[in-house]
Design a protein with these regions (language model features):
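The substrate-binding groove and active-site-proximal loops of carbohydrate-active enzymes
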Residues: 71, 77, 117-124, 142-152
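Hydrophobic h-region of N-terminal signal peptides that target proteins for export
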Residues: 9-16
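Active-site core of glycosidic bond-cleaving carbohydrate-active enzymes
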Residues: 25-30, 56-96, 156-159, 206-225, ...
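The feature captures the catalytic groove of carbohydrate-active enzymes
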Residues: 56-59, 63, 102-133, 139-143, ...
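Catalytic cores of carbohydrate-active enzymes
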Residues: 20-31, 41-47, 166-178, 213-289, ...
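Active-site acid/base region of carbohydrate-active enzymes
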Residues: 21-40, 44, 94-103, 142-206, ...
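Sec-dependent signal peptide recognition
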Residues: 1-7
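Terminal, non-catalytic domain-edge segments
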Residues: 399-431
């Protein structure tokens, strides 16, 4: 029966549905109506150490996070010029933390309004240094606001944050970047990384290298717009160097796959995880190779494609599961996550898979709408095979009530707007 379904599912996905743009408009309308009630939960007024209004995932999470805030703020900026201020303020709140902490550019990836972070590693998280999204957020906000000058007072903060990452997460031998732990990556238990305290800083990571490449390009853009020509050239050269190193060391042509690589041996970590596909949002591969990677793995039910979105780990992997968990790790070993599905959506669009991108937007739209109708909010991840919301649950919450989740799930609206309105111009910033 499984084989029969897999064959049917593959054939169905091979043919884009007719009148996709027209058919997604009612779904967009319903999702937009539901999100109008949930979106305000992600915005908190300035307080404590935060000089500006700040962004939170809402529900289970009350803190300001790095990539959560980036995705939420990007969504808000996509919706209107007025709301781009929240992405701007997210950047400035993190930049302000760099000044307040005063630790040579170190800023953690999560901040609290009422408690200054202690500059020392934790047993589980390690140093948990902020991910490379701040400059990208600054560019998206600046483009939407039509104003780059607000970045000038925070420019040196951004420079120090980038320099800290170069000192602590860059391997000059390989000319590539590594995560300290899987937790730092945001994909808490990603099997292509490790949380072993005896094996920290061990794995050169394709997703981090891609994010850092884009961060370099964003820094170059900011420098150019601020009239800093020498610094603009510096960051563009670093981006070009990093791209070349990724192709040399992380791309395995015989497998048509990017793999993480161990720093000590140079051996690939041959696990097909969702993070392997992040480079497809950038022009790193020749187009033909990128399309091969998508056809063979990303849009293939035997690997990444599931009935309810794109999995976080290949179905063929021995660790594949859809267990509901949130503490100490959320589950990135199978469930569907909206933020990474948004990246896959961008990759599909970039590589010319228009019908597949529209189908993915529709699948995710129906997924979150069903969740909202049942629970009044959403979950942070979903069972890839059944569409069931996984975490957080009432049992995982301190007060034993369903807390919900909003956060980056708002990006479903952006994907549907791109398809239903045939306007994707704001989903990526100018390179």
């Amino acid at each position: 029966m499984r084989l029969t379904f897999a064959v049917f599912f593959t054939v169905w996905l091979a043919f884009p549905q007719a009148n996709t743009t027209e058919s997604l408009q009612p779904l967009l309308d319903d999702v937009s109506s539901a999100y109008a009630k949930l979106e305000p939960q992600t915005i908190r007024p300035a307080e404590g150490y935060f000089k500006y209004d700040y962004l939170i995932p809402a529900g289970f999470y009350k803190q300001m996070w790095d990539w959560d805030g980036f995705f939420i703020g990007s969504h808000l900026a996509h919706q209107s010029r007025e709301q781009a201020k929240y992405l701007k303020w997210w950047v400035l709140n993190f930049a302000g933390a760099e000044t307040t902490i005063n630790k040579d550019g170190w800023v953690p990836g999560v901040l609290l309004a009422d408690k200054l972070p202690v500059p020392k590693p934790s047993p589980i998280l390690g140093w948990f240094t902020v991910k490379p999204f701040l400059a990208q957020g600054a560019v998206i906000a600046s483009e939407r606001l039509r104003d780059y000058q607000w970045v000038a007072p925070a420019w040196e903060n951004l420079r120090r944050i980038v320099a800290y990452r170069e000192r602590t997460q860059y391997d000059p031998k390989w000319e590539l970047f590594f995560w300290e732990t899987a937790m730092q990556s945001g994909e808490d238990n990603n099997v292509a990384l490790t949380n072993d305290p005896k094996d920290r800083n061990a794995i050169l990571a394709v997703d981090l290298c891609t994010f850092q490449l884009r961060e370099y390009k964003a820094m170059a853009r900011l420098a150019e717009m601020l009239g800093k020509k020498t610094e603009a050239r510096e960051y563009q050269q670093k981006a070009d160097k990093l791209r070349a190193a990724m192709l040399k060391h992380l791309w395995f042509a015989q497998d048509a796959m990017f793999f993480n690589v161990r720093r000590d041996t140079g051996e690939p970590v041959q696990r097909i995880s969702g993070s392997n596909f992040v480079p497809l949002i950038e022009d790193i591969l020749p187009p033909a190779d990128a399309r091969t990677m998508i056809r063979r793995y990303l849009w293939n039910p035997e690997y990444m494609l599931a009935p309810f979105g794109i999995r976080s780990l290949s179905k063929r992997d021995s660790s594949y599961n859809n267990v509901s968990m949130i503490d100490p790790y959320s589950n990135w070993q199978g469930p569907v996550w909206i933020n990474t599905n948004y990246l896959y959506f961008l990759a599909l669009k970039r590589c010319g898979f228009e019908g597949e991108a529209a189908q993915l937007a529709g699948i995710l739209g129906r997924l979150v709408l069903a969740d909202i109708h049942k629970w009044g909010s959403m979950h942070e991840c979903y069972h890839a095979e059944t569409g069931e919301g996984l975490a957080p649950t009432a049992e995982q919450s301190k007060d034993h009530a369903f807390p919900g989740f909003v956060g980056w799930n708002l990006l479903v609206q952006d994907m549907l707007q791109c398809e239903a309105k045939a306007d994707c111009s704001r989903l990526d910033w100018p390179m």
